[in-house]
């Protein structure tokens, strides 16, 4: 499992002072960026160096409690890889309370529209290793 802290800023909130959902989605996407960088395969290098990437094909979230400016949110990411895709599952907690949960489904695909390919073993191993932690 990968974990990081996101601080909700005033600029992340709506006129009622509650974190606006697109900013939460941004925080989750940033979490997957950070995870991929930590395992040694940043999204931004995959296309240039390996001729494939992990485009987003499905996303879903449920919001359980509001978040406010100043909240420190512990975001967890758990990866669930298959042969040609990976599902990133997220949970966000503020003061120990589940604020949201969700997922991103990403397919391993060749650049230039070549279609889905198998996740390389060295990346899949990193996904599996982070589940086992």
Outline where the language-model segments fall:
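Hydrophobic beta-strand-centered segment that forms part of the acyl-chain substrate-binding groove
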Residues: 35-74, 78-85, 101, 107
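Hot-dog-fold acyl-thioester-processing enzymes
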Residues: 1-55, 111-133
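HotDog/MaoC-like acyl-thioester-processing domains
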Residues: 63, 68-69, 80-133
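Short loop/turn motifs enriched for small/polar and acidic residues
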Residues: 11, 57, 91-93
